[in-house]
């Protein structure tokens, strides 16, 4: 197993143990019945957040993406980007980070942006990409500030076609972002990694979800984003 594969499998295992990645029967926002659910909101204490940040930082450095700073879209991205900046500094790569407010302030420092000045090549840090709305807003903010969106860094790529349970699109939200903005989307792990984890989990209860996850992949899935 390559070092990158080990990192991805380590993240899946960590997410399962933290209760962030769970198995059962879940209805997604698109109305699809999924055999797994990824809830990044459960990374809710200092130790878990610190570990997540390490995964983000290592994945970003290993990706080869050239970057000068990080941007965290409100709200989840704020914590994720700031924690990742701390982890990067611990790895010898100290960069600035910024985030946006949902509502601009008209007093104090004012405006909708907080943190380091947006400049150079900016990596957008978020948990997942669903409809791509957060990415679109982030790209606009970054470009309007005179900086360049360099990549999007996410926790999990579901590798799932857009649409709903009946109308299934040709591409995933991640692929749409890459095509529209011409920048890479880097994920710590994806659905293929989840299937690999279930193959070797050694837990009969988990192994039972492997066939369901594979069937879901066959129906709604797309090829992995490289």
From Swiss-Prot:
Pathway: Pyrimidine metabolism; UMP biosynthesis via de novo pathway; UMP from orotate: step 1/2. One of its GO terms (molecular function) is magnesium ion binding. 5-phospho-alpha-D-ribose 1-diphosphate binds at residues 29, 75-76, 101-102, 105, 107, 126-134. GO terms for biological process: 'de novo' pyrimidine nucleobase biosynthetic process; 'de novo' UMP biosynthetic process; pyrimidine ribonucleoside biosynthetic process. It comes from the Bacteria. GO terms for cellular component: cytoplasm. Keywords: Glycosyltransferase, Magnesium, Pyrimidine biosynthesis, Transferase. Orotate binds at residues 37-38, 130, 158. SUPFAM superfamilies: PRTase-like (SSF53271). It catalyses: orotidine 5'-phosphate + diphosphate = orotate + 5-phospho-alpha-D-ribose 1-diphosphate. Pfam families: Pribosyltran. InterPro entries: OPRT (IPR023031), Or_phspho_trans_dom (IPR004467), PRibTrfase_dom (IPR000836), PRTase-like (IPR029057). The keyword Magnesium applies. Its EC number is 2.4.2.10. Its cofactor is Mg(2+). Belongs to the purine/pyrimidine phosphoribosyltransferase family. PyrE subfamily. Homodimer. Catalyzes the transfer of a ribosyl phosphate group from 5-phosphoribose 1-diphosphate to orotate, leading to the formation of orotidine monophosphate (OMP). This is Orotate phosphoribosyltransferase. It comes from Ralstonia nicotianae (strain ATCC BAA-1114 / GMI1000).
